[in-house]
Amino acid sequence: FYDELGSSDWRFSNKIHSTFSDKQGNLWICTHSKGLEKVTFRSVQFSMLTPEEHSYESLSNEVRALCEDKHKNIWVGLKDGRLRVYDANHKYLGFLTETGNVSLSGVPMKGTVYDITQDSKGVLWIATKGDGLVRAESVAPNGLSYKLSRYRYDEDDMYSLSNDNVYCVYEDHNGRIWVATFANGINYISKDKA
């Protein structure tokens, strides 16, 4: 698919940051300015979620990260710094706050999210640009309240992150969490510390 910018039938973004395929077989596309696009390979071909309608250049529509959690909620990391959460039916539930709650109000969790993954224990790992790595452990059965812990760079601690610009997080088959930073290498968190 390719659309000519500004044409009256412009429907899809030509600038894509990443893609994600969920457990239902949908393809989610993180775009630069058109928000989050969803391709469904069923009777309905496409649906689009745009956090800021009619404001295509808004940072609220620049999607950087996606993750589906064990509750089938979709976590959407936006360049504006908000980590939005949608349920399986695409209903907006709110954003992750500094206190660890998914809410429609409050102070957003600090950091532009570049990657999100859920490990085998159900813990969410949130990679941020400039604000380190956030570990979010669910404290509510509905998955809308979390205990947040932040891993940061500390020049006096050789076991801290090597950089606060975290771009990717991955869990290996041994349960270790691998953390890729911008220009300062890869770190890992052993499974007993995760």
Functional labels for PLM-detected ranges:
Residues F1-A194:
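Carboxylate-rich, polar loop motifs that coordinate divalent cations or form catalytic acidic clusters
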